[in-house]
């Protein structure tokens, strides 16, 4: 078309020059008629010479003097690239469909793009046979083939300005037989998978009574608003008030139910409904607890010497206090907080003999340790009593010395309140030194 317009301009300029030179007195109407005829002949010759050109119909182009303008876009103004929305449209498309045109060129472009996208997915309409059907007037085999290919392709694979909208996530097409049966499951099962059938145990007599009389209880006035616990409580009271003759009826019903249940499920047991078969967690044994002779050191005097040998017990055990020889499971010693004396079962005393080879004291057993401690305390108490008696006799003249009562001395030894605190402190320090030497 560019060649046709250039040729028309050249003819127009040539005729104007020729008219000005040869016949300057020709009227305006005659010159315009002659110019239109010449332009018609030139365009016809150019179109007949070009291969694949569309022949004009009845001098359509000769009668219409079309010039490119923003309100009337010519085919030469439309982009014809491979990715353009106008690549598959016929050449005379803007002139055939003028109702989609607008004075605004941007709106014209959007109208063209929208129409092409609509026609790409729609079947060919018989209202526009000259635009899309391959006939002698508009032989467009390439356009028809391209449109046929686009019609066979899915919507989301077609090239076009609205192809991005076609990429939206939509459910794939599936035949009616292959559709998932979600609706059917929701209609029948409520959307929940049915669990395996749970075998219930047969009903007893009271359950049969409650099953039969619960609807009657609900029909009574005021019971429809009560909770289930209140209704069960009322049914229990009525069951206890029921005579034995009437209760026997429900016992027979329960017996028949048990027999039928046993015939139906011969291998069933009520233990299957409870957690009897579950594995119980094994209790881990405390590794700190040792067995044999080592465990003997952790026992108290009562467990170590027995109930009959109370003379071998330590003083805290005799007074039902914490034992000074027993140790807890962590290995630490249990000390008596009242009298402040505490030592291990393997401590040594002053009477133990040392080895001549290695100069290390030999540990004594528990009875020897207790006896040594008693002897030490008795000796210290006797020495203190003798010292006090001698000082008293020398200090007082003309008086007879007091007679010592052995029962009083024994009671003083047994009771901690009569022992001098200084002696107790010295005894504790001595015992601590001996225990350090043993360790």
Curated annotation (Swiss-Prot):
The keyword Nucleotide-binding does not apply. Residues 422-439 have a biased composition (Polar residues). Residues 1-38, 254-298, 329-365, 385-439 are annotated as: Disordered. Phosphorylated on Ser-125 by lit-1 in the beta-catenin-lit-1 complex. Phosphorylation promotes the interaction of pop-1 and par-5 and the subsequent translocation of pop-1 from the nucleus to the cytoplasm. Keywords: Activator, Cytoplasm, Developmental protein, DNA-binding, Nucleus, Phosphoprotein, Transcription, Transcription regulation, Wnt signaling pathway. Its main location: nucleus. It is found in: Nucleus; Cytoplasm. Residues 87-138 are annotated as: Involved in nuclear asymmetry. Part of the Wnt signaling pathway essential for the specification of the mesodermal cell fate in early embryos. Required for asymmetrical division of somatic gonadal precursor descendants which initiate axis formation required to control organ shape. Similarly, involved in asymmetrical division of seam cells, a stem cell-like lineage. Represses expression of target genes via its interaction with hda-1 histone deacetylase. Required for specification of the M lineage-derived coelomocyte and sex myoblast fate. Belongs to the TCF/LEF family. This is Protein pop-1.
